[in-house]
Structure formats: C-alpha cells, structure tokens
Amino acid sequence: MALIRRAKNKVAPQKRAETTIKKATFDATKKKEVGVSDLTLLSSISDDAINQNLKKRFENGTIYTYIGHVLISVNPFRDLGIYTDAVLESYKGKNRLEVPPHVFAIAEAMYYNLKAYNENQCVIISGESGAGKTEAAKRIMQYIAAASSTHEASIGKIKDMVLATNPLLESFGCAKTLRNNNSSRHGKYLEIRFNEQFEPCAGQITNYLLEKQRVVGQIRNERNFHIFYQFTKGASDTYRQNFGVLQPDQYIYTSASGCTSVDTIDDLHDYQETIKAMQVIGLSQEEQDQIFRMLSAILWIGNVTFVENNEGNAEVRDTSVTDFVAYLMQVDSGLLIKCLVERVMETGHGSRRGSVYHVPLNVVQATAVRDALAKAIYNNLFDWIVDRVNVSLKAFPGAVKSIGILDIYGFEIFEHNSFEQICINYVNEKLQQIFIQLTLKSEQEEYNKEQIQWTPIKYFDNKVVCDLIESKRPPGIFATLDDSVATAHADSNAADQAFAQRLNLFSTNAHFDLRSSKFVIKHYAGDVTYDISGMTDKNKDQLVKDLAELVQTTTNPFLSTIFPDTIDKSSKRRPPTAGNKIIKSANELVETLSKAQPSYIRTIKPNQTKSPRDYDDQQVLHQVKYLGLQENVRIRRAGFAYRQTFEKFVERFYLLSPKCSYAGDYTWQGDTLGAVKQILQDASIPTTEYQLGVTKVFIKTPETLFALEHMRDRYWYNMAARIQRAWRRFIQRRIDSAIKIQRAIREKKGGNQYEQLRDYGHRLLGGRKERRAMSLLGYRAFMGDYLSCNEMKSKGAFIKRQAGISEIVVFSIKGEALHSKFGRSAVRLPITIILTPTTLYIVGQTVAQNQVSYTVDRKVNISHIKHVSLTNLADDWVGIYVQGENLPDPFINTIFKTELITHLKQLNRAIEVKIGPTIEYQKKPGKLHTVKCQISESAPKYSDIYKSSTISVRQGRPANSRQAPKPEKKSTLLSDGPSYNSNQSKGYGQQQHAQPSYGQQQQQQQRYAPQSHATPQTTQKKRAPPPPGQQNFAASAAQTAYHPQQASHARVPSTNNAHTQHNRQPAQQAAQPVQQAAQPAATTSQPTRRVAPPPPPPPPTKQNIPKFQAAYDFTGTGSASELPLSKGTVITVSKQDPSGWSLGKLLDGSKEGWVPTNYIVEYKESSGPPPPPAPPVASSTTGYANSNNNAFAANDNVAAVAGAAAGATAGAAVAAASLANPGQNAFSVGLADALAARANTMRLESDDESTGNADEDDDW
C-alpha cells in the first residue's frame, strides 16, 4: 500500500468555472462586422473610401460609425430595433471601445465625463434636413434619463418632464417637408441640469428662430406644424363645440398644400401623446384650453377671405368668420375687421402731433395683414409654451452642472430659397465653424502652442462665409438687409430693390455671386440661390401697430399674456429685425457651447426619397465632402485622443501613484509636471503613448485613457476591500477575545472539561499500562474532534460527507489498520476513526483517477462492543471486541487510544477495558486471535513494529506515572492574541492557544506537511525565562533539540546568561542529525539538581543528503508510487511525511518512491567514534513542568517530525526527536521533544490572514 499525496492547493477541475474569467459563449445576436467601425482604421483615406465604408455598413443595417470620438450616423428610415432597454443596458458603464458604435455610447461618455471631470457637457448634432438629428437628440435624452435613474420621486418627476418635452415641442415645432416627415422647423437647445449627486434636478430650453411663415403657407405636398392636424383630427367634442373645430381639409392653412395625411404619421395617437406631455409638464386644464383656443383662432383667421369693393379696396367676404374669430380672441368684431382692411397712419412734425389717416388696403395687403396676425399669435404662443416648460423644469433647485443637447434645423437647399433658408443655413454655418474651431483649427493651434511634434493638415475654414452673412463692419448681408428696410420701410418693393442694389458691394467676395433678382452664397454644404423678393418684409418681423393695439383690447387674459403689455409709440429707436435676432441667438448659442465639453454627431441622409433601402452615392459623397470627414479622419489619425492641463490630470489620476497619494490624499511635494511624469511611470504607460507640452499632457490613443480610468476605478474597489478586511479583523479579534475570556471564566469556575476528561481516561487505565511521554504533558487535553468534522469547511467535514455520516461527531482522528489480504497482514493502511454518540466508523480511503475518495470500511454499533483490549506496554494498538456481528473485530492503531476508549466508556458504561500482555480479538468471526507485545530497543522511538502478530515497542514511562501539571502562563507585555497587523509568517513558532480547532490543525497540515526539516520561524512571542534554579536538564535537552549547533558548543546556562540564551534567535536550519545509541534513564522524585559537563564538540557535519538503510524487506503493493526495498539497501530521503511514509530514492537515482518510515533507519558512515553522552540528570516535578515551559517558548523545530495532528505515530515523533539531538540522554531528549511537539500540535491557532483558500473545502 502506498500513500497517495495530492497538491495542497490544487483546485478540482469542476471548480475552474468559478474564476473571474467567464465561460465563452456564442452570441447569436451579434452581427457580422462589415467595413470598419472607426474610419481612422481605413487603409486609404479618401472621400470615396469613406463613402464606400458607410454604404457597406448601411446596407448591412449598421448605421453608426466613429471617427475617433465623433459619431457618424446614417438615417436608416426604418426601425432597426437598436434602442430597446436591453441595448441601452448593455452600454451602461462601458467605454466606446468595449461596445459597437452607437448614440448610446456618446451619451454614456457624456454622462461619465460629467461625473468624472465635473465639467459641463454638450452634444452638437449637425447635418442636413432629414438626416436624423431630432431622433439622435431623443435617444440621448432617453439614455441619460435611464442612466441617472433614482428612486427619489422629485428626481423621477424631473426626468419624466424632460422626456415629455420631446412630444410637446415636436408637435408645435416640427412639420412634414419634402425631405423629412418630422423636420424641425425651429432650433432647440435643451440643458439637463444635475445636482451634486449627478441626478437630474432641473432643465432649460432655449428656442431659436421658429419658422412662423409655415403657419400661413407651405409648398406643395408639405404640411403645417403637426399640432394643427393632431388638433383638428383628435379634438374632443367640447373643443369642437366651443371652439368650432373642423377637419383639417376645411381650413385654408392646413389644406392649401394638398397634404393633410401622411402614411407614417398617426395624428390621433400623437395628439394623445401631446395631451399626456402637457399633463406631465404640469400645464393646467385651463392653460390647455387656452392653448387650443388660440390654435382655433389661428385656423379661423386663415379662413378669413377678402373681395374687392367698388373702390378697389378690400373687404371681408364673410363677416360670420370674423365674428367667430373675434369670439375666440375675445375682441370687438368691428375693430377686428377695421384692422384687417385699413391701416392707420399718423404724421407728425417734431414734438407736435400730426394728423391721423385711415388708409384702405387692397386684397393683397389685407391678406398679408391677416397672415401677419396669425403668425404673431402662433409665434408668441410657441414662445410662451417654451417659457412655461422652463418654469416647470426649474421647480427644483440645486443644479451645479449640465448636459446640453442641440437639436436644430439642418442645412436646406430648395428650388426657391428665401429669408427662412438663409437664417437656417447661417446657423448651420456657425455650428460648422464651432466644429472646425474645436476639432481642426484649435487642435492644431494647441499643438503648436504646447510645442508638440505635429505635421499641419490643411482644411477649409468657413469663417469667411460667416463673416459674409453676419459682419457689421464691413457690412454683411444681414446688415445690408437692415439698411434697406430702414431706408424704404413703408414700401416692401422699394426695400427689395434697395437691397438688391446694395448687394453689389459683395461682388468681389469669392463666396458670393449676384444674379438678376437672386444671389448665391457658397456655403460649406454647397451653393444656395436665394430670392431677393420678399426678404425685406420678412426681415421686419414687426407686428403692425393696428394689430398690436387690437390684441391689447382683448378681454382674454391668456392672449394678453403672450403679447407685450404696451406699445411705446414715442420711441424713435429702430425695432430689432429678424436678422438681428438670429445673429444674437446664434452668438449666444456659440458662447453656451464653448463653455461645455462638446461631443459631436454628424448625421447623413442617404437619399431624398426617404427609402430604407436606397443609398445615393453622389448625395452621400457630397455630404461627406462638405462635412469635412476626410480632414477629420486625417487629424484624428495624426493627433491625440485626450489632452488635459497638468493640474486637472494630476487631480484626476494622482491616486494611481503611491508616491503622489496616501490613503486618498495628495502627497506629492514637487510641481505638477513632476507629478504627471510620476503618475504615468507608475501606471506603466509607454512614453510613445503620450507627450508632455508646456501646460498640458497629451495622450495619443483612447485605449490608454480608458486604461487609466479603469485603474482609477479599481483603486476605490481595492480601498473598500482593505477597509472591509481591516474591519473584519477587528470584529474577529473582539470575538476571539470574548471567547478567551469566556473560556477562562469557565475554567476558573468549573475547571477545564477537556482536562477532566483526560484525568478520567487515566483512571480507566488504572496504572496497568506504560505511558508515552507525550501523554503526560501538562498541556495534553482530550479535545475529541481533532479533524473538525462538525465544522462546515474542513477536511474532516469532507470525509464525513463522503462517508455519509450525518450524526454529531464526538471523536475523530487519523489512524492505521492492518491489511486484510493474506501475506500482507503486517502492512498498515491509513484510516480515519470517527466516533458518534451511537456508532464507531472506520473510514478507509481509495484512489481513483488521481482523486481520493472516502468510504466506510466498518461500522460498529457502540452498544455491541463488549470490551476493548490493550497491551500493558507503551504501544498504540487497540482491539475492539464486538458481539452479535458476523464480522472481524476492528484492530486499529491510533496515538490517541486512551482518549478513544475514554469516549467509548462514556457512551457505553458496560464496555470493559482489558489491559494485559496480549490483545485478543476476533480476526475471523468466532476465532480469537492473540497479539503479543514485547519490549525492543530496536523499535522506532515514536512508533512500534508489528510483525507476525507481535508488537515490538520501546520501554515506556512507568504505568503509575502522574500527569504533569499544566504550566502557568507567564505575564508578558505582548498581546496574547495573534498579531493582526504583522506581516511575519505564522508558523509553528507562533504562540498558540491551548485548545485547537480544525482550522488550526488543517493549516498545519496544508502548509507544513510533508517536510523533513522544518525551517524555524521568528514569529514566536518572547516570554520571560524561568528562574535559574528551575532550569533542569530537560530544558537543556529542549534547547538542544531546537539549536543543536549552539548546544554542542555551549555550556549549561548560568544565572547571568540565562535570559540571553532564552531569547536568542533560532538557527536558520537544523544541523544534520547524528545517530546516537539510546540509554534509559531512571526518574526520581528527589528535588536534586546536578549540572552536566559539556560534551566535546562533534566533528564537522557534512553537507549532504540524509541517507537511510532499510531495516526490513519492503515488497510494497505493486503501486508505481512505492519503492520496494530489500534489507540493507541504502537510499536517500528527501521528504518525511507525518503519516509515516518517506520519499526515498536509490543512490544511483534510478528509482524514487514512498517507503514506510518505520522500515528505514539512518545510515551511519564511518566517521570516527561519536562523543560520549552527558550523564543523566534527575529532575523534580517542578523542574519537569518548567522544562515544558521552555519547550513551548522555544522555536517549534521538532513539530514537523512529531506530526501528531497529521496522523503520525507518537513513536515516530520520539525517534525523530532523538535523531535531532546528538549526545543527550535518549529519554530526556524524547521527553523534551515530545513536550515541544505535542504542545505546538495542541495549541495551533487559526490565522484569519492565512493565504489558504477556505472555500476549497472539498479539494483534498
């Protein structure tokens, strides 16, 4: 039989899936990558290559592509199912390289940067009309609302209100055009504001240039604003009755273009969503009623028509319509008609009041006045709605940072372009200028300023186009338009002619071209031809004074609210024009965006037919060119993905350097540049990945930045783990301290139950059996469950589960039994002995597929045990006589035999304990077998020899030997508990507890067994030495066991040097043991003390591998791991296992395997006679107790060879101790070593800082 050894920390194959590496699974939903996800990865950079890559991805249903951190979005004109909650969740907490390109990735980056850098964020979405800008803005709002979710009611309400602004403002600000069914006809900049916890707490919407002309007229197949069709189709009966609401085809303003319905638009559903949005935002029912009352008034104003009277002037065709309009506006009907067909003119001379004239209007002029009234009401109504939404969004204070989302009309080129188009295209020019400033121009200028190595890249700067439109000196197009209006304000045609003449000033501008009644501006997106006719009139943007006075007469408070309160008739100041307003708004927008960190989304429209399958190469190629994607790719490939000032960078990442931080505090004493270098060095960032400028650090690739961010995130997790670990140590120390106090109190009151059980066991022997030295130790107590079978995670629990034992375990220990096969009856097999209140289990182990399994070999009912049989010598064999079972009796060997029979006796008082010169048991049912026992000095010191039914054992202590008293603990300044803050190793040398647990013994087995010579540790606690008068020979023997080299040259300690020798550091490695003949020593109770003369120094030890000689033949069981030996064979031994097996190798190195330790003895080479032994010294009981004390305080070098907890026999431990102490009395040496071995075995304490994996309890 061979001992099967397994790796101490080997993980079972089935547990490998519990690592942090997830098992690879096939993602059936992942689409095959088509093209490249980042245009910077293209092999060739050209407009055609970019176009082809976008086309491949579009045809594959992949609409998003990156240029670095810029997102390119191609409108799919269909639902791809990529905005679900599951997709949204997959982007949370991910950087853009971990997930495919998506608008959610841009939103995640914005929200992360807001929290990480505490800086305002914005996203600039640009592209032509119908490219998908509004949809992208909605998806960003969707993601931010989900990512910042919270259970707080007020925060949730703000998020709902922010999301509700989408359907509300889309209804009032979007319309169907030829290019887009949901085209934004106004600009909107939404700021979502966050509190200090980065939760949305407020919002702000800024409106830019509503296209109010659409209210009164649209080109063919376009529609008015969505709200008119929603209201006319979905209005309630109350509204229809009170406001006279009809179907959209009955109103001129909604039916003139010939398009009242669109296949992809559900007006009835959208109307319900609009009503719901009003309720979420907080509009009262009264406010909703007034809004729809004004919409009805606008529609009915459009139905007012005029005819020419006899004088050629205009008059109302049907006054019932004007009467109903006056009812809705709550003004006088006659005054309304008068304002529509007449114009009041007043003349004056200086301060004198002039005459007032009523000038009749013709049909065309009256129609223009009618439309002006409708446009004014709708424009002011829209502004009021935006202001009202802002009031609701600002209801919660505490905003500190914001994320801005810009959704504005795209670049427009129509067959006929007028004032609205030049305003829209001007704003897009400003946005393009921002993009150029921040991504192209300023980036290259910054590289030069920071002295970064850089090759300049050419690009088109559209600042010249912006100056052409907005400049005041020299005057631009808007300034020229204002001058024309001021010169001929009364006559629109004259003003248009004056404007046309002034346009000649721009004839030398390369981006301007004047044609008859038209002019061309060469925008970045292409050349646009504008009509001069009507521009000056649209630029006035002023309500006729008569209409303003009409509105002020209303009795409707809501209508009065949405219009200015008063009209300053005496003001000579020129009122602001529409051009002035749009320039001011655009500059304010640029200023707002410049205060935030921008993200960019460039949208592309694949075709003009809004088809989900068509991809117009020429149209997309044109957009690729004017968006400047090629230049952006070139700069991104050559530039740096991240740049930050030294101060900001250090503030963000100083935690990554231990030289710059301690416990979260900034500790760097040098300048910020030095801190930046130190951080990058400690983070192991290659120098090729960054450059240091004058004031900023530049990081080349986003992967490097993401790595820094990941390390910073992990820092907090590590800190939290350290705090948790320290807290758990503190709590455990309190628990351990409480247990120690409770144990001490219990022992003080009722005595130690384990020692009381031990004393009962001694009485059972009745002075009839010789004792082993370790059985008489003062620290010896009957602990019972030495394998900790009752714990949850232990080897004993594992054995218990495999054996199918469910009862509480009273006693458990390792042992040996004889091989039952004929011819091998002297071979010992390792077993596990488990005793429960009703049953004695003998558990054997088997090996299959390199795994050890445990099964019950014998199950004995305690009530069936008649007697137990032991010899009167110092062996460890026990025969258990069982009656009523047709099976052989158990015949076992265990070092804790006395404790076993003590527990059996307590569980069954009828069991008889037989002690004699022989052991009788039933080797076969009904057939008694007798085993004799004899004294033999050739037997192993700590074990015995079983052969031919005869046990050979050395002489033991007298049968009437008394138990040594338990040594008293010495007072010390050091803590009795383990050092939780020490980084020293926790081995046998550590001061331990009197009561072991499974964790303590198991740590000893896993961490130190098997080994032939344990290395002494330096972590033992320093105790005060005993008085000089109490240092006897046993103490000297113990010191010799731990320090053989020192002891061979040192004299017996005197009074002066006792303290010094006691606290001396242990040697780094024990010397090679020398075989010494054993000499019996008699014990005496006389308190005499003699000092032994020092022995002569031994010859120098040879530094060679220990050699052993086979004392008996060992045939083995045929296992490949065994090493068969014949008597006299000399081998080298590299390891000795406490279980009684040694790893040996033949001298020629041809074979290596395990042999029983009891079968080999140390091989003595001829090296001269050994030194004579020192004479024995008798010691009193007091001296013996103090020798125990010294044995426990000294380093536990002999613990590895004692191996009691690991299942080794006591005889083997005594033999190993004898070999480790040359020149000493055999009995005294064995006693000293036994003291140290048993004490440390019984006092091992578990260490909560152990590196062992406690969770791997099944891996044995």
UniProtKB/Swiss-Prot annotation:
Purpose: Type-I myosin implicated in the organization of the actin cytoskeleton. Required for proper actin cytoskeleton polarization. At the cell cortex, assembles in patch-like structures together with proteins from the actin-polymerizing machinery and promotes actin assembly. Functions as actin nucleation-promoting factor (NPF) for the Arp2/3 complex.
GO biological process: actin cortical patch localization; actin filament organization; endocytosis
Domain notes: The myosin motor domain displays actin-stimulated ATPase activity and generates a mechanochemical force. The tail domain participates in molecular interactions that specify the role of the motor domain. It is composed of several tail homology (TH) domains, namely a putative phospholipid-binding myosin tail domain (also named TH1), an Ala- and Pro-rich domain (TH2), followed by an SH3 domain and a C-terminal acidic domain (TH3).
Binding site for ATP: G127, E128, S129, G130, A131, G132, K133, T134
GO cellular component, one term: myosin complex
Residue ranges of coiled coil: none
Domain TH1, chain residue ranges per copy: 769-959
Gene Ontology MF annotations: actin filament binding; ATP binding; hydrolase activity; microfilament motor activity
Annotated S-S bridges: none
IQ domain location: 717-737, 738-763
Segments of this protein annotated with the region Actin-binding: 402-484
Keyword Cytoplasm: yes
Protein name (record): Myosin-1
Pfam families, sorted: Myosin_head (PF00063), Myosin_TH1 (PF06017), SH3_1 (PF00018)
Species this chain originates from: Kluyveromyces lactis (strain ATCC 8585 / CBS 2359 / DSM 70799 / NBRC 1267 / NRRL Y-1140 / WM37)
